[in-house]
């Protein structure tokens, strides 16, 4: 049997991809408790096609507008009011519109950890604001399940934090 070659040249002692269950999210410098799912870290660049009048057979393609999908955060319902408090900055019953134009946009930080609990990758998501908030998942007396709270965040882009470098595997 041949010895197994390292699959990841930047960290040769690592053989397996990172798992999807070891992560944390923070905003305002605080980790948000109980988040169980993060989805929507997606960037799409549109295609602009054009054709020259003398070219009969092909069109040219160039990059168009780039859009960033909403980020969806889900967590088991707890007594922590972070989702609700942020949503109330955007719109609060009785106030009629934005309650705080200064504070309703926030940058969030999504951190990924390896099996040893070491930070290996992070993403900065810019100028997020809640566009949808679901304080309770479906209530059903016939099912034993955890209640889920959901927050959909619009954003103006994200980037990988390149200052986060995976530690050497030993």
At which residue positions do the language-model features occur?
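Glycine-rich, low-complexity intrinsically disordered segments
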Residues: 2-170
């Amino acid at each position: 049997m041949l010895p197994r070659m390292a699959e990841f040249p930047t960290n040769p002692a690592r053989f397996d991809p990172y798992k999807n269950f070891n992560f944390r999210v923070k905003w305002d410098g605080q980790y948000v408790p109980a988040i169980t799912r993060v989805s929507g870290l997606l960037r799409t660049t549109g295609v602009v096609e054009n054709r020259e009048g003398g070219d009969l057979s092909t069109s040219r393609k160039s990059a168009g507008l780039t859009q960033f999908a909403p980020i969806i955060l889900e967590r088991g319902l707890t007594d922590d009011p972070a989702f609700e408090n942020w949503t109330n900055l955007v719109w609060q019953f009785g106030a009629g519109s934005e309650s705080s134009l200064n504070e309703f946009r926030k940058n969030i930080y999504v951190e990924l950890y390896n099996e040893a609990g070491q930070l290996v990758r992070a993403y900065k998501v810019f100028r997020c604001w809640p566009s949808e908030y679901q304080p309770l998942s479906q209530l059903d007396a016939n099912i034993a399940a955890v209640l889920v709270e959901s927050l959909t965040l619009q954003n103006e882009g994200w980037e990988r934090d390149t200052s986060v470098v995976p530690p050497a595997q030993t």
